[in-house]
A protein has these predicted regions:
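Conserved alpha/beta-hydrolase
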Residues: 1-23
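Catalytic nucleophile-loop/oxyanion-hole region of alpha/beta-hydrolase
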Residues: 19-47
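Alpha/beta-hydrolase fold nucleophile elbow
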Residues: 45-56
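Hydrolase active-site cap/lid region
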Residues: 71-121
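Short beta-strand/loop motif that positions the catalytic acidic residue
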Residues: 140-141, 147-149, 153
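Conserved alpha/beta-hydrolase "acid-adjacent" motif
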Residues: 154-160, 186
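Catalytic histidine neighborhood in serine/cysteine hydrolases
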Residues: 168-184
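Catalytic active-site module of serine/aspartate enzymes centered on a nucleophile-bearing elbow/loop
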Residues: 181-207
Length: 207
């Protein structure tokens, strides 16, 4: 945001329903609902061609948005992008006891690496996620894509970036792997790398 302000580029950011300052309960959120949030911002607030930057689940959302609005999205930058995480990194990793519990109670609490309290995963999140999986078939993208992923990410394996590159139909897909980088990529060097990626993409598609 500071970089965009400094160079005079328009910038929009938002919290999904149930996140940050937005209303709603996190446990009521689903990939589909957050996709609707993304399209509402893209259609109702952001004007003109857009470069989307998404981190983790936001990376899944940017890919969905680019597929839904190909005429609006001219570039994508993913940071530890996590498409299909509800299926590949949650459901398929749950043991039988966890699967039985979430199916019976509708919610499962998992330990968090970032908070003292566990975070909730709803059955609705898992089931709805199956309607939005992207890595099982070719993913139609008509714009440049730059994926940045830390190689010691313990939440989303770096191989996910390669999977995205493999299914994306765009001829312009690049992957930057950060040796020693974790999931959040929030160190000063990581932010400088992201800033450079944003500026390079902006110059490439806009200027």
């Amino acid at each position: 945001e500071a970089h965009c302000q400094a160079v005079g580029r328009a910038f929009v950011r938002f919290d999904y329903t149930g996140h940050g300052e937005s209303s709603g309960r996190f446990t009521d959120g689903t990939i589909g609902r957050w996709h609707a949030d993304t399209l509402a911002v893209l259609d109702g607030i952001a004007a003109g061609p857009q470069i989307l930057v998404g981190s983790s689940m936001g990376g899944w959302q940017m890919l969905l948005a680019a597929r839904a609005r190909p005429e609006r999205v001219v570039g994508l930058i993913g940071i530890a992008a996590a498409p299909d995480f509800t299926e590949d990194l949650m459901w398929q990793q749950f043991d039988d006891a966890a699967k039985i519990k979430i199916q019976a109670e509708g919610i499962l609490y998992l330990p968090s690496d970032y908070e003292d309290t566990p975070y909730p995963v709803s059955l609705g999140l898992i089931e709805d996620g199956r309607d939005h999986l992207l890595l099982r078939n070719p993913l139609t993208l008509n714009c440049p894509v730059h994926l940045i992923h830390g190689m010691v990410d313990t939440d989303v394996p770096w191989q996910t970036a390669l999977s995205i590159a493999e299914v994306a139909t765009s001829d312009e897909v690049s992957v930057t792997l950060v040796k020693g980088g974790g999931h959040r990529l929030s160190a000063e060097a990581d932010l400088a790398r992201l800033t450079a990626a944003v500026e390079n993409m902006a110059v490439r598609v806009h200027d």
